[in-house]
Amino acid sequence: MKRPFISRERLKQITETYPTPFHLYDEAGIRQTARALHQAFSWNPGFKEYFAIKATPNPAILKILKEEGCGVDCASYVELLIAQKLGFTGQEIMFSSNNTPVEEMVFARQLGATINLDAYEDVAFLQSVATLPEVISCRYNPGGVFELGTDIMDHPEEAKFGMTKEQLIQAFTELKDLGVKRFGIHALLASNTVSNDYYPELAKQLFQLAVEVVEKTGVTLDFVNLSGGVGVNYKPEDKPNDIAVIGEGVRQAYEDILVPAGLDQVKIYTELGRFMLAPHGLLVTHVTHKKQTYRTYLGVDASAVNLLRPAMYGAYHHITNLDRPDGETEIVDIVGSLCENNDKFAKNREFPVSEIGDLLVIHDTGAHGYSMGYQYNAKLRSAEILLEESGQTRLIRRSEKPEDYFATLYGFDFEK
């Protein structure tokens, strides 16, 4: 059973000020996770977490993470702009993009961000649009399938990201000859893994690659970036990842592979988004309708506009009825109001018998929740609210208004 980070009584008070639906974030939980991550990798003096802005691009959240010693991982011009406006500078910014527009690459160089090249062809592209930096990273794709034990976790061969080993070695060789001084290796081989073994296994593969690359090219290896991929237990029956165990697993691989090769100064970087934020966000919504046809439908005032993952991926998010957490249950679909049949937060789910007006929370929406929102059916994006450590709430993004929707249109006068 998942428990919200806020009591029913306190949340009821908040809904008296802010109408549902809205996203609510827990500052205390965010800080706790950031500190646990840094403790887990404290054995590596150069460790740095680059929070993936794409997961939760709200300045208030990013400021909290900056205070906790995190950098940011950016993948677009506006994400770079957010980082700049918040005071992230130079190598506090990791720029991991693909099919990168010229203006984005140029801006990343202007900011002094560490650039993570996605393709071998980007070596020539970067030279053609900007000067080469002293430090650069290349993204590795091993191809094939990625396995943990007997489980297939993902299919890197199908991913559009990264370069082959041969391409990476060639890129390092050329970049070294062109004057680049220090190098990094980056890879993401699976997403949302709920396993303490993912990072250690990834680390083994990248550390072995690092040793081979250094031997063949003679480059100075500055860091290995494990990227993201460490997930959260969206289903309550799944055991959550233990970041302390994960950090120790990476340390053991580091001691076994890099240290004997004389690479004991290599820094470890991560680009966690989901792990850092997902458990510390709730989508708060009310039951607005109840319908009985071939199924029982609970209609809520949130929709896929507010949380796209279930509609796009069929992703599971646990849902709690705070007004009726226990008691008799029924099988329901919990749905929004979009004109799309995939606008469903839950399908055929056993759920407490609910009534119109009941207060529900959808769990683990702190990452890839608001950020994946859109405006289909001319729906307006909801507010974001921060539950501060003091227990007070702060509006960190207001809900959209109709005039926001019309603001970018020409030839239409909203005021008439």
Predicted feature residues:
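Structured core elements
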Residues: 71, 94, 114-116, 137-139, ...
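Glycine-rich, aromatic-flanked loop segments that form ligand/cofactor-binding clefts
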Residues: 131-145
